[in-house]
């Protein structure tokens, strides 16, 4: 990043530096996702506690508010009940943030996200981006229904792995 501030760089050199920086960010994100999946597969998240996912979801939804507002995406939460679960808090956060990101990334500008919380489930629905996901493959690692820049194709695989632990 400091190199990009160098005024002596040509436009071409700056462009190459920016590409390299984006590639490094992608590789870092991919590495973190694969490490998380490996830890989940190896059962390394043993510390659990009673969590109320309604509050946790709203807390992380607030973090995404500006991003959703930027694309004019309306988010509605219907709370039919409180969702209590005993699980690892880090995994709960990873699950919810992956689902929130996915609902945003695979949505259209001016779209909607509907989140329905019951005693035993949380359902995410969005208006979509015009490209339906293949139901047989959406939880496969590296599957991407439509290639999104910076996407690793691991978000729903992580969410699926976390849910299978419960």
Protein language model regions, located:
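Short alpha-helical segment of the dimerization/phosphotransfer core of two-component systems
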Residues: 20-27
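Conserved catalytic submotifs in the C-terminal HATPase_c
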Residues: 49, 74-84
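Detector for a conserved hydrophobic position within an alpha-helical segment of the HATPase_c
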Residues: 163-164
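Short beta-to-alpha transition helix within the HATPase_c
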Residues: 52-64
């Amino acid at each position: 990043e400091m190199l990009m501030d160098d005024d002596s760089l040509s436009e071409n050199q700056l462009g190459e530096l920016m590409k390299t920086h984006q590639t490094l960010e992608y590789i870092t994100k991919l590495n973190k996702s694969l490490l998380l999946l490996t830890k989940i597969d190896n059962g390394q998240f043993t510390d659990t506690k009673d969590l109320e996912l309604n509050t946790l979801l709203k807390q992380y939804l607030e973090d995404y508010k500006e991003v959703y507002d930027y694309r004019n995406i309306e988010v509605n939460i219907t709370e039919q009940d409180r969702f209590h679960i005993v699980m690892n808090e880090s995994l709960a956060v990873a699950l919810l943030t992956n689902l929130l990101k996915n609902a945003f990334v695979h949505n259209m500008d001016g779209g909607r996200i509907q989140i329905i919380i019951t005693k035993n489930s949380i359902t995410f629905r969005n208006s979509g981006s015009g490209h339906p996901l293949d139901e047989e493959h959406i939880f496969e690692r590296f599957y991407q229904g439509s290639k999104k820049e910076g996407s690793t194709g691991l978000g729903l695989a992580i969410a699926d792995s976390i849910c299978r632990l419960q």
